Amino acid sequence: MDSYVIQTDVDDSLSSVLDVHVNIGGRNSVQGRKKGRKARWDVRPSDMSNKTFNPIRAIVDNMKVQPNPNKTVISLSIGDPTVFGNLPTDPEVTQAMKDALDSGKYNGYAPSIGYLSSREEVASYYHCHEAPLEAKDVILTSGCSQAIELCLAVLANPGQNILIPRPGFSLYRTLAESMGIEVKLYNLLPEKSWEIDLKQLESLIDEKTACLVVNNPSNPCGSVFSKRHLQKILAVAERQCVPILADEIYGDMVFSDCKYEPLANLSTNVPILSCGGLAKRWLVPGWRLGWILIHDRRDIFGNEIRDGLVKLSQRILGPCTIVQGALKSILQRTPQEFYHDTLSFLKSNADLCYGALAAIPGLQPVRPSGAMYLMVGIEMEHFPEFENDVEFTERLIAEQAVHCLPATCFEYPNFFRVVITVPEVMMLEACSRIQEFCEQHYHCAEGSQEECDK
């Protein structure tokens, strides 16, 4: 009689086939070890996915709170200027997209780093005597977020570290840690309009530091560094031989009483990868077109970093071709009045919000100079029923239906961030509700009754 004997190795969870013994017509044979996959399904998420962590999502998604149903929700939390419809892009920008689409020229693949003609336009737009640019110095990306990702990936290896601001945009940590790159936090100083604590910054640098991330103008702070402060940052980077990743997506989005200086315009010796895009200045974040500007006047990056960026860009075959086709018209034909009107609105809202919140006992807003944000300190000793900024903002939602992001999302507890792109009437209403909320929960600190009686 024919027979089959299968020998297996059994442990607590999995079994695998070792040998197959076959008897056919009285003749024995061993078919040998069965190699290949294990006998049981074992599909697990990658290490990269397990290391990927978004602080904003982790905090916001765990807020188990419903807004007051008797009030209309006012969201001051979303950094998307298109949400309320009050800040449309310029008609010239929209027409440029229509023309590119109607032309039928941009339906295929482009080079992974972008069309040469589109890169020439970006280089021409940002070229200046202090920081000259050519098309070879431009990499087009799928939004500024991908630009930042490519820069981190080309500059840092797993086990190295990067320096990022606190408070700062959470994406830096999310991207770095997913790649096995350590994050070190340097402090911004609210009492100095969020300037960098340069001494503390320099103390963090070691032999494994791959780059310094500088975000100017700042999300979440709305701060804009002075020329003098930028020069001091460059001096630290030059002393320590650390390249800079400059996140300048809010470049030129500064208020009339302030001046924006691109970091590369001030740098002779420090190599800089500057990240920008259409999202914020042109108010089209969903169009997903960003860029990397390579500034390397001393040829410190050499060909290796440039070639590395090209190779990394080939992973997704480049950004949207239709937007690239519209880029020349967008950069050349958007009227100055559009930029002026946008900034005038943002400054008006910033002044309104700052003035209203500064008058509320227990709050300490920091006046912004640009971008789309304002940070507000909470004097927690006057709100003892709340343990931290997360609880404060949760109750603000529950009672007043006003949604602000707790600054724990940006590694800076006991502050919250306000987005200033909402319509003016909505901003006024939000500030009024925040005032009512604070008045209901404010308590005099011990020994300060005189202040409360004022």
Curated annotation (Swiss-Prot):
**Which domain of life does the UniProt lineage start with?**
Eukaryota
State the Gene Ontology terms under molecular function: amino acid binding; identical protein binding; L-tyrosine-2-oxoglutarate transaminase activity; pyridoxal phosphate binding
Q: Which UniProt keywords are given for this protein, alphabetically ordered?
A: Acetylation, Aminotransferase, Phenylalanine catabolism, Phosphoprotein, Pyridoxal phosphate, Transferase, Tyrosine catabolism
Query: What pathway does the UniProt record associate with this protein?
Result: Amino-acid degradation; L-phenylalanine degradation; acetoacetate and fumarate from L-phenylalanine: step 2/6
What's the gene? Tat
Any one Gene Ontology BP term? tyrosine catabolic process
Self-association and partners: Homodimer.
Q: What class of enzyme is it?
A: transferase
Q: What is the lineage of its organism?
A: Eukaryota, Metazoa, Chordata, Craniata, Vertebrata
Sites of N-acetylmethionine modification: 1
Tissues expressing the protein = Liver.
Q: What is this protein called?
A: Tyrosine aminotransferase
